[in-house]
Design a protein with these regions (language model features):
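Cleavable N-terminal export/targeting peptides
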Residues: 1-62, 317-318
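Transmembrane beta-barrel domains of Gram-negative outer membranes and organellar outer membranes
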Residues: 39-185, 200-207, 211, 255-260, ...
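Outer-membrane beta-barrel proteins
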Residues: 81-83, 97-100, 148-150, 190-194, ...
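Structural signature of outer-membrane beta-barrel domains
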Residues: 98-100, 130-132, 182-186, 225-231, ...
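Transmembrane beta-barrel outer-membrane domains
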Residues: 101-105, 151-157, 193-199, 215, ...
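Outer membrane beta-barrel transmembrane domains
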Residues: 136-138, 146-147, 235-236, 242-318
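Detector for outer-membrane/organellar transmembrane beta-barrel domains
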Residues: 195-266
Length: 318
């Protein structure tokens, strides 16, 4: 019996070289959370601060599950894809620093991308391996956090994507379908870092290449889809959002510069309408690549983020 596309991809990926397997193993192990052994703290300070009394809804109901009231990696705007699949597998490790008054955050994340079926299908998994945060009392109180000193280490959610090439190199623009599941593996919901709840999004991305006589490639890009995630609102347990993005690539001599504006528009209007500008510069070598990105939050996600990525390029699965 034929395996589902997603499982088939992992089966094929298992035959990749040892370097790739070891990196993925490290990626998964780093996301495993160790059980807490510390003594249960006294929550009197939180109860007094927010006027909580016995019989009122539990503290989880006070956390606002939206990007404006969680950490920078809790409900991020999905990456703008380019309407087509890359031919080579990639393993990427990224160091990020998020600048925001009162909540400076640093993290290390990982990504694995595996194309197969002659470049018609690909799978991707990614997530924050470890995050360090240190926010001030004002941020703590605004987000109803129960982390009294606002300092700690958190582990991120894991994302699984399946991508299918619908059109490529035709008169019609390149078109890529992406469906992504977000797990609830993120930790420290009590510190308002992650939502401790699943979500998913699906989108179509489009692009068209235009090349000048000088060899400069210009590629406009667009994205349209939806994003849905679970909340703690007992009357509306799910928030749905319109996902959007547009931008362009400039490519020449293994260099690529990208600029875009992306975001999503939630229906609850409780800090669930993030919008951001994205700028990236990538340099490709034979078997590796370097990527530098800057993200500038405009609305409901006000971090300014720098990312530095190292990428290993491997042969595609067959």
């Amino acid at each position: 019996m034929a395996l589902p596309i997603f499982l088939k991809g992992f089966f094929i990926f298992g035959r990749q070289i040892d370097t790739m397997r070891n990196l993925i193993l490290f990626f998964f192990l780093a996301l495993i959370r160790l059980p807490a052994t510390a003594q249960e703290p006294d929550w009197g300070w939180w109860n007094n601060l927010h006027g909580w009394e016995s019989g009122m809804p539990g503290w989880r109901n006070w956390i606002i599950i939206s990007p404006a009231y969680l950490g920078p990696n809790a409900l991020p705007v999905p990456e703008l894809k380019r309407g087509f699949l890359l031919n080579k597998s990639e393993i990427e490790v990224t160091a990020s620093t998020h600048f925001y008054s009162g909540d400076p955050t640093q993290d290390i994340s990982g990504r694995a991308y595996i194309p197969f079926a002659e470049g018609k299908i690909a799978i991707e998994m990614y997530g924050v391996i470890i995050e360090h945060y240190n926010y001030i009392e004002e941020i703590r109180n605004e987000r109803f956090s129960r982390d009294e000193d606002g300092k700690g280490i958190a582990f991120g959610d894991l994302y699984f994507s399946t991508m299918i090439q619908l059109f490529k190199d035709r008169k019609f623009p390149n078109t890529l379908l992406r469906v992504t599941l977000r797990t609830a593996s993120g930790s420290n919901i009590e510190a308002a870092r992650y939502s401790d709840a699943p979500g998913y999004f699906a989108d179509l991305s489009f692009s068209k290449d235009f090349t000048s006589k000088e060899g400069l490639l210009f590629r406009p890009i667009g994205m349209l889809g939806f994003y849905s995630w679970q909340t703690n609102d007992e009357l509306n347990l799910q928030n749905d959002a319109l996902l959007y993005g547009m931008g362009a690539d400039l490519e020449k001599n293994a260099w690529r510069f990208t600029g875009s504006c992306t975001g999503y528009f939630g229906y609850k209007n409780n800090g669930d309408r993030p919008m951001q500008l994205n700028f990236g510069l990538r340099k490709d070598f034979k078997n590796t690549a370097l990527n530098v990105q800057y993200q500038h939050g405009l609305h409901d996600w006000l971090y300014k983020t720098l990312r530095f990525s190292f990428i290993w390029k491997l042969n595609p699965a067959h």
